[in-house]
């Protein structure tokens, strides 16, 4: 079962990283830190929980008490609390980009630069042949939003009907003349769209 775990960022084990360590190169939060001697040290207590059956990067999403793992090869797995990874791929997630997901009341949707794929029931399937080729997908108050890959436009579905993509249900973000490369829906149902220059 998926669950959030508080990470004690302000505890002593995390406080000994010098600020200069972050100025000496790129940094990101993982299961390691840079010591005062500028070496890497792994946090204690972390261990492998499950090895995925297929190689590649894995993107995790929580869905109805399970973890959903999507690999960079497009395979989708449902991971139960008993450490089993069941392949639920009928239609792979394609596009070759980082996988994004949106949760509706009944399904979870995936986009990665190709057609939008949904997991509803036991297997994945194509959301709609009319849906845009998208790198990002989001859900707000009964509407599914998706950017049109390589453009400044995004489309939305009819309310509550996620397979219905009317060609007139489109907006253009024209504050900057660049393609939309990000779509985020905040916990307050605000939609943020961004591109490389905006």
Task: Give residue ranges: language-model regions.
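Short linear motifs in intrinsically disordered
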Residues: 57-59, 65-68, 98-100, 105-110
């Amino acid at each position: 079962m998926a669950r959030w775990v508080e990470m004690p960022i302000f505890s002593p084990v995390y406080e000994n990283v010098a600020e200069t360590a972050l100025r000496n190169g790129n940094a990101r939060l993982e299961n390691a830190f840079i010591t005062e001697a500028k070496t890497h040290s792994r946090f204690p207590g972390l261990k492998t929980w499950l090895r995925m059956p297929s190689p590649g990067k894995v993107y995790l999403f929580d869905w109805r008490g399970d973890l959903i793992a999507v690999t960079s090869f497009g395979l989708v797995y449902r991971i139960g609390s008993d450490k089993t990874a069941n392949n639920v791929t009928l239609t792979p997630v394609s596009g070759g980009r980082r996988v994004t997901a949106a949760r509706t009341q009944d399904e979870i949707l995936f986009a990665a630069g190709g057609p939008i794929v949904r997991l509803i029931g036991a297997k994945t399937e194509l959301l709609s042949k009319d849906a845009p080729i998208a790198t990002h997908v989001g859900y707000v108050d009964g509407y599914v939003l998706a950017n049109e890959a390589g453009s400044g436009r995004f489309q939305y579905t009819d309310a509550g009907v996620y397979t219905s993509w009317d060609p007139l249900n489109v907006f253009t973000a024209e504050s900057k003349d660049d393609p939309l490369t990000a779509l985020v829906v905040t916990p307050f149902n605000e939609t943020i769209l961004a591109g490389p220059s905006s």
